[in-house]
Curated annotation (Swiss-Prot):
Protein name (Swiss-Prot/TrEMBL): Gamma-aminobutyric acid permease
Record-level Gene Ontology MF annotations: gamma-aminobutyric acid transmembrane transporter activity
Pathway: Amino-acid degradation; 4-aminobutanoate degradation
Gene Ontology BP annotations: gamma-aminobutyric acid catabolic process
Upper classification of the organism: Bacteria, Bacillati, Bacillota, Bacilli, Bacillales
NCBIfam families attached to this UniProt entry: GABAperm
Disulfide pattern: none
Length: 469
């Protein structure tokens, strides 16, 4: 572990880490966003989620391997710095920070919109501000308070999914009182299992892969737990059943109980199922659950941005002020920085929703894939090095190395290329490329400045300054 990590308090318990890892899987994308995938893919959406989930399982296994060797709040940014080069750590760290800053704004706006469902007269901007401030204070107080909030947010989501699965299976097989078995006729009765063709399933993977962003947060949190190797190992090994049960299982229930082309599935598949089986106030219940998912994501976003900025500051790749810790070991200035820029994005949504805010949202669109790609490449290089120098440090190992690592890299590159041919995603890919280019240029400026400072500090060696890699 990096020595500088000693400043962060190790207050996250195993139960916190377990729920943080679960929270990363269950988000609003499952409760709401899955409807568009089902509507465009049909029952084959189950395959889309399974294949995308498999890719994320591979990524998490690789990240778990590296985290068990070096559990740090910098996580994959630090690993990229060590394995690929400082430019990679700098670039992916700042891109990831930017991604979550925008996510915080999106979730604050989404949460405010849900609350307006019950309280119509409260302005959207005010509710967004209140939600952001409350969860900012939670994160500022201590890492333990972040963990507690995330624990209960996650518990609500887990209980909801488990209840949904139990009730769904009961209606499918006719175990529910007064019900007839629904069976699996809806899986093939409306044009077959792949009514829109295999190509729609592959397209679905491109859309679905973004729903899993957040699973990697547990590796960032590893730097603040007393037993990081055990926590990361458990989280990494359990990601398989979490994705299968929560995502694939839930989508299978939806397409089994309702025809895939039902209009109400597009709006909210979970509400559609609950209304279909006669659950009273289904919309109200799901609004509360989605609000919980949104607040969980907002809470995680505030935590994640602060720790990534803290890690960048440790490596002198961000202002050193973001390394300052409170008495409880919290990087307060790093948290406030994420909150500040996120609320600027909220203001942009109020004044310029179709230009500035849309640009910010689209420009962060493909960053998730870049993060996954960097994780895979870092693991490929680090694993080869560790096998030669310190093989006993490998407490967790990626399966079938290096074959599955190469396969994952190829799959991610394939998804990035396919985005260029999908009208609804082309802008996201292009704008993410623009933002990535800006960050890379910033690194070159940063490197040049560091070289100049080093030369000024060592005038004897000015003629042959050491160039950073």
């Amino acid at each position: 572990m990096n020595q500088s990590q000693s400043g962060l308090k190790k207050e996250l318990k195993t139960r916190h880490m377990t729920m943080i890892s679960i929270a990363g899987v269950i988000g609003a994308g499952l409760f709401v966003g899955s409807g568009s995938v089902i509507h465009s893919t049909g029952p084959g959406a189950v395959v889309s989620y399974a294949l995308a989930g498999l890719l994320v399982i591979f990524i998490m296994r690789m990240l778990g391997e590296m985290s068990a060797v070096n559990p740090t709040s910098g996580s994959f940014s630090q690993y990229a710095h060590d394995a690929i080069g400082p430019w990679a750590g700098f670039t992916i760290g700042w891109l990831y920070w930017f991604f979550w800053v925008i996510v915080i704004a999106i979730e604050a706006i989404a949460g405010a919109g849900i609350i307006q469902y019950w309280f119509h007269d409260i302005p959207l901007w005010l509710t967004s501000l209140i939600l952001t401030i409350v969860l900012t204070l939670t994160n500022v107080y201590s890492v333990k308070s972040f963990g507690e909030f995330e624990y209960w947010f996650s518990l609500i989501k887990v209980v909801t999914i488990i209840a949904f699965l139990i009730v769904g299976f009961a209606f499918i097989f006719g175990f529910a009182p007064g019900s007839e078995p629904v069976g699996f006729s809806n899986l093939t009765g409306k044009g077959g299992f792949f009514p829109e063709g295999i190509s729609s399933v592959l397209l679905g993977i491109v859309v679905v892969i973004f729903s899993f962003m957040g699973t990697e947060i547990v590796a960032i949190a590893a730097g603040e737990t007393s037993n990081p190797i055990e926590s990361v190992t458990k989280a990494t090994r359990s990601v398989v059943w979490r994705i299968i049960v929560f995502y694939v299982g839930s989508i299978a229930i939806v397409v089994a109980l309702l025809p895939w082309n039902s209009a109400n599935i597009l709006e909210s598949p979970f509400v559609a199922v609950l209304e279909h089986i006669g659950v009273p106030a289904a919309a109200q219940i799901m609004n509360f659950i989605v609000l919980t998912a949104v607040l969980s994501c907002l809470n995680s976003g505030l935590y994640t941005t602060s720790r990534m900025l803290y890690s960048l500051a440790e490596r002198n790749e961000a202002p050193r002020r973001f390394m300052k810790l409170s008495k409880k070991g919290v990087p307060v200035q790093a948290i406030v920085a994420g909150t500040f820029f996120s609320y600027i994005a909220v203001v942009m949504n109020y004044f310029s929703p179709d230009t500035v805010f849309l640009f910010l949202v689209n420009s962060s669109g493909a960053i998730a894939l870049l993060v996954y790609l960097v994780i895979a490449v870092s693991q490929l290089k680090m694993r080869k090095k560790l096998e030669k120098t310190n093989p006993e440090a490998l407490k967790i190992k990626m399966w079938l190395f290096p074959f599955l690592t190469y396969l994952t890299i190829i799959a991610i590159c394939g998804i990035l290329v396919s985005m260029a041919f999908i009208d609804s995603m082309r802008d996201e890919l292009l704008l993410t490329g623009v933002i990535t280019g800006i960050v890379l240029i910033s690194y070159l400026v940063f490197r040049k400045r560091k070289v100049s400072e080093k030369a000024a500090a060592n005038p004897v060696t000015q003629q042959q300054p050491d160039i950073l890699p």
